[in-house]
């Protein structure tokens, strides 16, 4: 075998090794992405990593989310909880007019860490936003729940209507909503969950079991006169 033949064989071996490596990476990378998304959806990623991954995931998937929302495949955009409080999905700039004119909403509680909201549109309509960012799929802590409830109370005293939202109006904002119902109606968390599901069927069905929801309830609601039989 001459020198040229040796070089050719070496190049072939290198090309084969590179192709094999690319094939392995082509299998491992999609698996890693799928596993990361799964762990993210179950709040099993470290919160610091989940925060940055959630922002990237929102940027990559928001067009799909908007399409599904428009098609009505993600449930209702907005649901009314009582005379003054609404719960729903994250609003885009084009939704602010709807919130302001149709629903007479002028106060917002935004729990999206990944999205600060259409703040310029809020300013245009004189709407006030309480921004309490919580990483997607994680539960708001007790301080955030209490801060949100106090904001809602203050806005109602001022004659304003409030819109609570996260990305889909299911989990993070659902935790605020169930605490609001338990606090304002003086009912148990189990009853509050039933009321909330009647108002918005797509909220998480186990909100009343969440740790911080129960801690808030014990600290701020339990000493009130609880009516465990209040009708929906």
UniProtKB/Swiss-Prot annotation:
Protein keywords: Golgi apparatus, Hydrolase, Lipid biosynthesis, Lipid metabolism, Membrane, Phospholipid biosynthesis, Phospholipid metabolism, Protein phosphatase, Transmembrane, Transmembrane helix
TM ranges: 20-40
Compartments it resides in: Membrane; Golgi apparatus membrane
Source organism superkingdom: Eukaryota
Catalytic class of the enzyme: hydrolase
SMART domains associated with the record: DSPc (SM00195)
UniProt cross-references to PROSITE patterns, sorted A to Z: TYR_PHOSPHATASE_1, TYR_PHOSPHATASE_2, TYR_PHOSPHATASE_DUAL
GO terms, biological process: phosphatidylinositol catabolic process; phospholipid biosynthetic process
Pfam families from the UniProt entry: DSPc (PF00782)
Family that this chain belongs to: Belongs to the protein-tyrosine phosphatase family.
Name the UniProt record assigns to this protein: Phospholipid-inositol phosphatase
Origin species: Dictyostelium discoideum (Social amoeba)
Name of the gene this protein is made from: plip
């Amino acid at each position: 075998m001459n020198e040229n033949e040796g070089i050719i064989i070496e190049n072939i071996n290198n090309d084969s090794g590179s192709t094999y490596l690319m094939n392995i990476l082509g299998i491992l990378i999609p698996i890693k992405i799928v596993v990361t998304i799964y762990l993210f959806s179950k709040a099993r990623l470290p919160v610091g990593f989940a925060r940055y991954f959630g922002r990237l995931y929102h940027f990559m998937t928001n067009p799909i989310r908007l399409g599904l929302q428009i098609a009505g495949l993600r449930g209702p955009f907005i649901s009314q909880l009582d005379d003054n409080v609404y719960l729903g999905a994250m609003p885009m700039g084009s939704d602010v007019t709807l919130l302001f004119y149709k629903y007479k909403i002028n106060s917002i509680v935004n729990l999206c860490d990944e999205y600060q909201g259409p703040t310029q549109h809020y300013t245009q309509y004189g709407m006030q936003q309480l921004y309490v960012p919580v990483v997607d799929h994680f539960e708001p802590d007790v301080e955030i729940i209490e801060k949100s409830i106090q904001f809602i109370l203050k806005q109602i005293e001022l004659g304003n209507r409030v819109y609570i939202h996260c990305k889909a109006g299911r989990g993070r904002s659902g935790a605020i909503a169930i605490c609001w119902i338990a606090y304002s109606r003086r009912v148990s968390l189990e009853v509050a969950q039933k009321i909330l599901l009647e108002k918005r069927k797509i909220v998480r069905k186990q909100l009343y079991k969440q740790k911080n929801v129960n801690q808030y309830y014990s600290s701020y609601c339990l000493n009130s006169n609880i009516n465990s039989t209040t009708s929906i």
